[in-house]
Amino acid sequence: QFTIDILKRDLEEEKIKTDNLVVIKPHRNINFKENSIFPVSLSHSVPDTVGYVLNTQDGAIFYTGNFVFDPTMNYPFKTDIGKLAYIGKQGVLCLMAESRYASKIGYTSPQHRINKVISEVLYKYEKRILFNVFDGQIYRIQEIFNEIMHTDRKVIIMGKRLESIINDAIDKNYIHFDKTRFSNIHNAKDENVIILISDEREKPFSNLDRIIKRYDKFITLNETDTVVFASSVYPGMEKTATKIYDNISRIGCNLIILPTDKYLALHASSEDLMLMIDLIKPKYYFPVIGEYRDQVANMKVAKEAGINEENVLLKLNGQVVTFIDGKLVESKEIISSDDIFIDGKTAGDVGELVIKDREILSENGVVIVSVTLNKATKQIVAGPEIYTRGFVFVKENIDLIKEAEKKALEIINENTKPNFIDFNKVRLGIRDTLGKYFYDETECKPMILLVNGEVE
């Protein structure tokens, strides 16, 4: 239900019909002709998380998704171990289990709990505290709320999406918190308020980055603030996160980053996987999710759990696994699994270089160096002048722009002879020299373009 509520809200914002959304319930079969799917409750950061048993004429396949075993977790985060044991007794052909934490020793629980460190933060820092979380990690948000309830502080939720998700979760008893403790965003300047800031996975730290750059009209960070990163950084986002950490430190805020080796996300560690294998007793084991090295670690866990090495399937994206009459059949079929980029009315024909250029433009902007030359003598008639879009605000960075124009002029003069100019060297020189200069001054790498014109 929780997932459907979020999906429905997002679809309605895009004016997409939501008539065909169906809420599935754990432990009730979903039938598709001769096949069926049986959802079973598992513990994760999202309420009502389920794994799926796909019952086919060739055997049952169980896909875990993300999970942990934690006997202290209650509804709607509780794993139904009895149902897992029942599924195992019925016979499972293949278990597809997540791999992200397979190399970690022991169980994930209780290392996923952050209540103690949150309590310490609330006790130590009496001024304004900002918690950065991911809006889908409801269990972690509940942990933060649990500790806030021991204080007299008010809570502000930044962002309509996060506010809507939390209010709906409270109304449906997914989150337990007193709504009278919520305050309005207009009170964000109060010095002892607590602010929850959330970012979507596709746009990590976007809201916090806007605050750091002083684009937000309600919140301005200062030296007395404390910023807590209460969610693990998703793989591939480490560089972005590091930049955010540095920018917060430059402001002088208290910066608290929960170490990922001490405070784990809700993913199965090696003992969680061992227990799942023991309950399900699969004939074949298929490590999924995570990097390839994680899947290799998961394969080793399965072998230690007693599964024959030839029955552990380690595959690359696109490779096909085929079972016929309960037996693994060799398949050389490959399914294309590369990213497909949709560009306007076309799909799949956008090259990597185009995508890279767009990433640079979106993250660092563009700098255009414009110069006009005499067509005959190649002498400069006007410029060079620099224009920027999405890089810096020119009026506040006049010295930066003037120095860049000076460097561009030097490069043009160095590569100009009577009646001749080497535009290739000029372009490369301007790109390299200004690129280094801008990075040294701003830590940004904008796209740099030379636009030259000639007049009689």
Question: Where on the chain are the PLM-derived regions?
Answer:
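His/Asp/Glu-rich metal-coordinating catalytic cores
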Residues: 1-187, 206-220, 239-242
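C-terminal regulatory/interaction regions
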Residues: 146, 150, 168-456
